[in-house]
């Protein structure tokens, strides 16, 4: 087991130690039982001594009961240790992921992280639980059984001494052959989960375009590939059982031959032969047990590599040693900023952007699809780090801020609006968990959400289903805006967050912004010119570069892109009227 993963055992160390100790006592009782059986056969039955048989029989029953007791207790402690270890490991990974930047998450993919925290950890849990019990049991059983066999027959002990390493080496060879295939299997599980996640999230789109058959075919393709990979791995592992069975029967036949010859010549008792055969079965059974655990360890080994990869991942963004812990105002400067999602050497999404947004200004951003509008604003709360240049908030490079302090003063309403399971109160309080009901209602009024919320039978106590699928797109956007406002940020960013809202409501939201939060810097990305027409400053982006900056009137005179969008939308509105 990887040392890094073992750090997650923590408070379950005691159970992890007690379980093998109980297993040792269980094995000790099991090893002594055949010796008592031999005495009953060779002395009690041979001499017809009923009293001796009863006496030794009672001892044998007591040993069996003690073995059962120790075994049950060992199983209980192993189960507690395994489940507790898995719980800690899930927590450790989950806490680690919370520190990941978008770039870190992109590296693993959402479905990949979900697979690691579910399937992979379950595999490790099973392997750990079996290891602290069965891997402790097998070596002790093999050693003690061999020692007991040595006291009964040197030839039989020598036979075991030859068989054990040969068989162990064979099993190890099989394990090494199968391991790479299991790694491929779990990598492909990510694709399988991704397919399911994508289909479930886009269920409405799939049905709207009648693409069920296509999605079924896509899922079947990934599922079939997982099946083929797993089958290949299992075909290799399947050699374990036949090899073990062959060795077991071969050893028993040789023992019967050696023992039978000894009984005929008078050098071995019948009870001793019986005990040796039982010890042989115990040894081979222990090796079969090891084989079974090896299969689990092989599967867990692939999972371990994937878990360690997450735990070893260095968060892209970390607080500096002397981090700035307060944001004075909403002044923003982009100083020769270039950015690539692939890092240095990658294709630039933003190219040499220079921009100054004064605190309290309302700034509109417009541009075609792929012009890097969202990319630009995501650099402000440091969701990504610039590739070149710097982004400054209140005159300080964002990389010098404490991340929590910076993001606490920058509220973003992303393109994809997310609501969580819970009441409307619960969702809005993501902006400030200590907010009063009155504060929640006030920000909803600003976001023009209070009206429709009060129309619900349960008002602000209305339950939102996962993803917010029981409210409309426009309602969802307004609730997300209210949530962002509750933080009382220095900077508010709306990334195309009023696209599902009618123009009248959109205008009311902007009016509320001007009147109620004049000192907050407001950055609005929009496709509708009407949403940003009255902004203090409008930025036109094209292919990751600033094509124009100015007011709406200035850009109509100087920027062809803005003029074209403006004219087409105004003309479209007139034609519609």
Task: Show which residues each predicted segment covers.
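Membrane-integrated ABC transporters
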Residues: 1-30, 37, 45-60, 74-78, ...
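Alpha-helical membrane-protein architecture signal
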Residues: 2, 14-18, 90, 106, ...
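An intracellular "coupling" helix at the cytosolic face of ABC transporter transmembrane type-1 domains
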Residues: 10-14, 77, 99-103, 119-132, ...
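Transmembrane helices of ABC transporter permease
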Residues: 11, 15-28, 39, 60-63, ...
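Juxtamembrane helix-loop junctions of ABC transporter transmembrane domains
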Residues: 21-22, 29-42, 50, 54, ...
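Short intracellular "coupling" helices and adjacent cytoplasmic loop segments at the cytosolic face
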Residues: 47-48, 83, 91-115, 119-121, ...
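Helix-loop-helix
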Residues: 48-55, 144, 148-162, 232-306, ...
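ABC-type nucleotide-binding domain
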Residues: 326-577
